[in-house]
Amino acid sequence: MINVEIIKNYSKWREHKQINKALIKKITQKTLSQFDNFSEIKQFELSILLTNNEEILTLNKQFRNIEKATNVLSFPANELNWQDLRFSGNEIASSNKPIILENLGDSDYMHLGDIAFCYDVIYNESYEQQKTFENHFIHLLIHSILHLIGFDHQNDTETKIMENLEIEILAHFGISSPYLLIK
């Protein structure tokens, strides 16, 4: 089960009714199902902030010391490393090591973290990249969840693994690779 708390701090988000708890739960479940490590956890929690340029700028400055609006910020609740994850049924990358859950407390429950999305940046990017707002949001949600569970894109190898996972999950929802449009 996935519990999602959504805070909408910007009225423009209300124009996109299909971006709701049900969609976020479905995307989160599909993303987590890519890894055997999470199959034993019965309950996940995720907090979502849907906001605007002003608030995301403040958050980006406060937490990353970057004075610029961005499309999304991810705040993991746990220090996980993607290299400790066991991939379910794909050959993207694999480890036989169990993920370390002892420091998380109750292994039946996992708070994934918090994600803040900026309407204005996502809207502009989707327009520039000729994508629907919803498809771009879904891609960014998958990308952010991967960050919450320890993925990063600090080098070419990690970037490729992350992008391949995103493409695979997006395809499940009938969404084309976002990287074909921007590369």
Swiss-Prot record:
EC number assigned by the record: 3.1.-.-
Keyword check for Translocase: no
Source organism superkingdom: Bacteria
GO biological process: rRNA processing
Keyword check for Electron transport: no
Chief place of localization: cytoplasm
Family: Belongs to the endoribonuclease YbeY family.
Function in brief: Single strand-specific metallo-endoribonuclease involved in late-stage 70S ribosome quality control and in maturation of the 3' terminus of the 16S rRNA.
Protein name (record): Endoribonuclease YbeY
Source species of the chain: Rickettsia bellii (strain OSU 85-389)
